[in-house]
Amino acid sequence: MMYSGKKFLLFSLLGILLGYLFHRLTLLYDSYTGNTIDKWTRLLMEGQDEVLQSPWNVSFTGKSSAFFLLGFVMMLLVYLYLETGKKQYREGVEYGSARFGTLKEKKFFYGKEFSHDTILAQDVRLTLLDKKPPQYDRNKNIAVIGGSGSGKTFRFVKPNLIQMNSSNIVVDPKDHLAEKTGKLFLEHGYQVKVLDLVNMKNSDGFNPFRYIETENDLNRMLTVYFNNTKGSGSRSDPFWDEASMTLVRALASYLVDFYNPPKTREQLIEESRLSQTEYQNLLKRQKKEVEERKKRGRYPSFAEISKLIKHLSKGENQEKSVLEILFENYAKKYGTENFTMRNWADFQNYKDKTLDSVIAVTTAKFALFNIQSVMDLTKRDTLDMKTWGKEKSMIYLVIPDNDSTFRFLSALFFSTVFQTLTRQADIDFKGQLPLHVRVYLDEFANIGEIPDFAEQTSTVRSRNMSLVPILQNIAQLQGLYKEKEAWKTILGNCDSLVYLGGNDEDTFKFMSGLLGKQTIDVRNTSRSFGQTGSGSLSHQKIARDLMTPDEVGNMKRHECLVRIANMPVFKSKKYNSTKHPNWKYLANQETDERWWNYQINPLNQRQENHLEGLKIRDLTFESSLK
């Protein structure tokens, strides 16, 4: 049992006062003459006045000391009685205190201006740009759940995009968001990029190799690719994927070094003789040179990995394949104690039929890069990801909603975005991007599996980024991130949740449980008929879901639920997008004047002038690094 320290101190002081009163009355009693009855009579009649006239007397006697202790102990006994017999009453919330939030509580999260906010519902907003007191400060991650036709794009994504208060990355599975909204962003000075996985011939280029800076980056990129290109056979036996990964790591690392050659032993010795200042200046120059080469398109591509795989085969009367010669020459120049050669050595451990099978699996794994449009899309990068946290940017990722063939590209895209912007925030901006970057993950289940996504929802928050996973039902998230119940971590890292309705029973139950229970009064009546009829009436309190699963399922089409961390749930109307002040600047159909017919071809985009006159090297005809 827990006792209150403050209350104990209070009763101790009262005990001292009561004990002192007993002490004074004892001294008065002993000072009187006469029999016992006379003394008590005088004490009761005059004792109070005499104590008040001369309150302070600390001349304790043995008898007065005993009565002082008696008064003190009596008060302590009162304290113990009250504490041990104390009952905890919470009238009206005995079985739960869940309730709907009020309009006043909604306004706690509003920003100074409407344009600073994220629109969650008609009268529910969460500030994106303004700093709030700690009790109303929430992270900006938002989970959105809604079935087909519930308004995920129309009621939530579109109105928040046209708030134009951040850089935005949005997945567009079917709504032609780029065409409908692109002109508005261009007119407001945004740089606009479109990665179109439906019509790859009309798309910006995306090459994740442009953003590779470390061996960990390379390994992570390949892991994303392999995880999102698994067939049913490789799921049952991971050996072939792991063996294939060994070969691809070696090839990819070789290509990275081909375009940005590592330092030779002689160069490392020479650098070791430099002073610390000279060495730091050298590193800055080298980093700048690497960035310049990447701007000129000097980085590998997945299609080149596919080409190198083909050079593993040997011709007639050929002792070594072209690829073996390439790696031998690499080892002569850079040694064998490096990431490239260690992976190549691991691959060479496979012999005979196992080796042939590994090559066959790897060839099949990269067969998609025989498609010309895929080769063109991934050859050169025009997305310029490192500008998104510095300049207002609008990036559309157009994905097919009925074909998962190129899901690996969307997974690679987001993995690269998180990795690149997080590193940029940490290194270039000491922790936070200058401009907020928000990612709208519409059709989240169709994007592909992003490694450590649960952790990303936590880490990007501090970098001035936010994630908005958008789901049709809770099962989509549970199915994609079921390992170690990562889906719970993802939802837990979203301080806001918007439910727009749907028709999934499991989601009804999930939302009902999330809303909690309330305490209600129940009146029971009974009546019996007969010769001696009687009746009774009783009242009791019971627990009840704030909204039962069937009530969640039967919400009106224009209603939604908004849960903000540490607040009662808000039941509100969905936002009326057509009333947004910028809605009139959007297009609705192709014949509208505001419709943006973008034409993009990354291979035809003019690069920096220093590309002119540059000799493009063909790996298939080179046997060594130059």
Residue ranges and their predicted role:
Residues 5, 15, 19, 34, ...:
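Residue-identity detector for glycine
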Residues 457-561:
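Conserved ATP-driven motor cores of ASCE-family P-loop NTPases powering translocation/secretion/packaging/pilus
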Residues 1-150, 154-157, 201, 517, ...:
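Basic- and hydrophobic-enriched, low-structure N-terminal and domain-boundary segments
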Residues 22, 27, 133, 138-465, ...:
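P-loop NTPase motor domains
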Residues 6, 186-187, 208-211, 525, ...:
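Low-complexity, intrinsically disordered or weakly predicted helical/coil tracts enriched
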